[in-house]
Curated annotation (Swiss-Prot):
SMART domains: RL11 (SM00649)
Quaternary organization: Part of the ribosomal stalk of the 50S ribosomal subunit. Interacts with L10 and the large rRNA to form the base of the stalk. L10 forms an elongated spine to which L12 dimers bind in a sequential fashion forming a multimeric L10(L12)X complex.
PROSITE patterns: RIBOSOMAL_L11
Name under which the protein is recorded: Large ribosomal subunit protein uL11
UniProtKB keywords: Methylation, Ribonucleoprotein, Ribosomal protein, RNA-binding, rRNA-binding
UniProt key word Cytoplasm: no
Function statement: Forms part of the ribosomal stalk which helps the ribosome interact with GTP-bound translation factors.
GO biological process: translation
Gene Ontology MF annotations: large ribosomal subunit rRNA binding; structural constituent of ribosome
Family (UniProt): Belongs to the universal ribosomal protein uL11 family.
HAMAP family associated with the record: Ribosomal_uL11
Cellular component annotations (GO), alphabetically ordered: cytosolic large ribosomal subunit
Amino acid sequence: MAKKIDGYIKLQVPAGKANPSPPIGPALGQRGVNIMAFCKEFNAATQKLEVGLPIPVVITVYNDKSFTFIMKTPPASILLKKAAGIQKGSSVPNKTKVGKLTRAQLEEIATTKEPDLTGADLDARVRTIAGSARSMGLEVEL
């Protein structure tokens, strides 16, 4: 018989740096989940990723207080800032440009984000990422 789902918890946790402090501890603690078990499993799963890269994770909590989790790809904005070498996007994206990205960089980000994007082909996914880049004040070379 399948386990009954008690709820879902959505968090962004830095890769390899999950620990019981906020926001992880309180979010899992109020559902009765073993916090250290999650931290150990998450850190083991993110071992191959760049340390500190925020990873969105959806934790499914069951009635018997067990859990499973699904990791998503890092947010596009973080990948774009890393590729452009900037700390933050433009506060006035239409007027002030803060960086420039080539099509090759956009394709690399689109292939990284492929599982989470809905585009039919690579070109559609690149256009999606390019739109995010423009809204951050980055110049895009397509």
